[in-house]
């Protein structure tokens, strides 16, 4: 594993993949919590996942969420949750356009908060792993 995440490019790839998984799991969990997991179908879930993933990758680089000197500092762990909160309105707007439906502000707030919390947890794990690998000879 150490060889895989030593370089900044590989760290960035790991973070991006993990971020996508966080948005995907948040989407699936949301459908499950609303009792719609079985009935929703892939296209309906994609109509939530894709816009919020898109919004995440539009907003997060502006807050330095993938900069090598920032992703390993615990003092910079505020960046991904803030990026998630700022990306949520854009994700909700893109989702509304995709579905041809009104944008529900409460949905954007809840999705932003849940993704922010999940992103914080994931990035805390990622920082620990990256720092451990770097300390082990990376």
Annotate the PLM regions.
Residues 2-138:
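Signature of alpha-helical transmembrane segments in polytopic membrane proteins
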């Amino acid at each position: 594993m150490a060889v895989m995440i030593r370089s900044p490019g590989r760290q960035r790839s790991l973070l991006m993949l993990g971020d996508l998984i966080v948005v995907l799991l948040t989407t699936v969990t949301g459908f499950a919590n609303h009792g719609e997991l079985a009935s929703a179908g892939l296209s309906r879930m994609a109509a939530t996942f894709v816009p919020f993933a898109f919004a995440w990758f539009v907003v997060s680089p502006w807050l330095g969420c993938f900069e090598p000197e920032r992703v390993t500092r615990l003092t910079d762990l505020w960046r991904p949750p803030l990026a998630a909160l700022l990306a949520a309105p854009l994700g909700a707007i893109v989702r509304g356009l995709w579905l041809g439906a009104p944008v529900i502000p409460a949905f954007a707030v809840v999705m932003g908060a849940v993704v922010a919390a999940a992103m914080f947890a994931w990035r805390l794990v990622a920082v620990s792993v990256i720092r451990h690998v770097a300390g082990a000879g990376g």
